Structures are given as structure tokens and as C-alpha cells.
Design a protein with these regions (language model features):
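Hydrophobic ligand-binding cavity/cleft-lining segments
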Residues: 2-56, 134, 138-140
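Short, hydrophobic/aromatic-rich segments at coil-to-beta transitions
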Residues: 49-56, 76-84
Length: 141
């Protein structure tokens, strides 16, 4: 598939999960705090919310800076969130999408599962694991 006359995009995908010692309500609410994304998603430098379902994220990948408009596509409270980048002037030749799921555990913990698909390059699997570890540290203190 060619996009804007560029070479075909290579898509990378990865999935990871982690158990966090906090209730699903607390974990979900913390993930919804978009302004905290740079604290655990190291590729995001800052986030600006546009409306209830859209925000612009300033990203840094492989020594390059991008701004990407993201759309929240699915929001099932305390269960699942899904988002994707929109094709726009910010990053016309790149695409990313993600789904994060929250599963309550019997010991008041929460299993967080993150799936990412990206054309921004780099090792998506190592980023997923790192983002989850960072998020766990942020939530658990």
C-alpha cells in the first residue's frame, strides 16, 4: 500500500500485559489521565486535549519528532479503551492504534493488557513492555 507517493508503510504490532496492585477503578482512571502519558509512555513528550475524543500528542521516535492527532474510538468504562491516529497534516505518512484492557483480579489487583500497532518504526514489543512497567510504577508509587 502506498500513501502520498511514499514507500509502503511497515506495520509493527505487539501485545503485553502486567498485573498492577490497585483496583480496576483506580487503574482505569489513571489511564484516562491523558496529561500523565509522558510519565509512562516515553515516546510521548506532551499531550493536548482537543475535545472529549481527540487529542494531539507530540511524539519522539528514532530521533525524529512528530505531532499526531489521536482519536478515542472505544471507551468501555473500567474495561477497555481503543484509539488510533488520524491521517492529517501532523503525521500523514504514519499510523498507530492501540487497545488497553483492564481485568479485575480476585486479590484487588488489575491485569492491564496493551496492544499497539505502529508504522513509526522501532521495536514495538520492547516499547509495550516498557510502557506497562512505567505505568505500574506510576500507579503503585
Amino acid at each position: 500500500m502506498r500513501h502520498n507517493g511514499a514507500e509502503p508503510r511497515t506495520m509493527n504490532a505487539a501485545k503485553g500485559s502486567i498485573v498492577i496492585k490497585a483496583s480496576v477503578v483506580d487503574v482505569y482512571q489513571r489511564w484516562l489521565a491523558f496529561e500523565d502519558y509522558p510519565k509512562f509512555i516515553t515516546a510521548i513528550k506532551r499531550v493536548r486535549k482537543l475535545d472529549a475524543n481527540h487529542f494531539v500528542a507530540s511524539l519522539g521516535f528514532n530521533g525524529k519528532q512528530y505531532d499526531a492527532t489521536l482519536e478515542m474510538m472505544l471507551c468501555v468504562p473500567e474495561r477497555r479503551l481503543a484509539w488510533r491516529t488520524l491521517a492529517d497534516r501532523h503525521a500523514p505518512d504514519h499510523f498507530a492504534a492501540g487497545v488497553v484492557s483492564f481485568a479485575p483480579l480476585s486479590d484487588q489487583g488489575t491485569r492491564v493488557t496493551l496492544k499497539l500497532t505502529s508504522s513509526f518504526g522501532g521495536a514495538v514489543s520492547s516499547r509495550v513492555d516498557k510502557y506497562l512497567r512505567n505505568f505500574k510504577s506510576l500507579v503503585e508509587g
